[in-house]
């Protein structure tokens, strides 16, 4: 019985060895031929046709990937800015309401300014605060004063010059 059971295993080993005979014996895609440049990576050379089927058409984007990435980021930025523009439309409405309140409070300020002492220095400070840094620097340049520094420093220089 043992002989009969060993016989089918021998025949199955022989059929399996037929399929495994051409495969590499060690490592992935290794060959039995000694490489001309030892120590470097072995080159795999495909021995079968790798061209795509006749009906297959491959289209690739010829544009540089960096440029494509930047354009996509720009498009995303524009779409997000469109969303923020929708909220910005609400902003001017609120600002208009704030301006109406400022008009009312400016009348009160004018009445209070005549009552308070030193109000001229406060209005001068407010005038300087409302100016942009560029305008403040232009004014300092006209007077021959240094134009470097923060906005508060620029305002202090203009006040001391006046």
Curated annotation (Swiss-Prot):
Source species, domain of life: Eukaryota
GO aspect biological process, one term: positive regulation of response to water deprivation
Sequence ranges of Basic and acidic residues compositional bias: 75-93, 142-156
Primary location class: nucleus
Sequence segments annotated as region (Disordered): 71-130, 142-162
Assembly notes: Interacts with UBC19. Binds to CAR9 in the nucleus; this interaction is repressed by abscisic acid (ABA) and is sensitive to calcium ion Ca(2+), leading to free CAR9 accumulation at the plasma membrane.
Full protein name: Protein LOWER TEMPERATURE 1
Source species of the chain: Arabidopsis thaliana
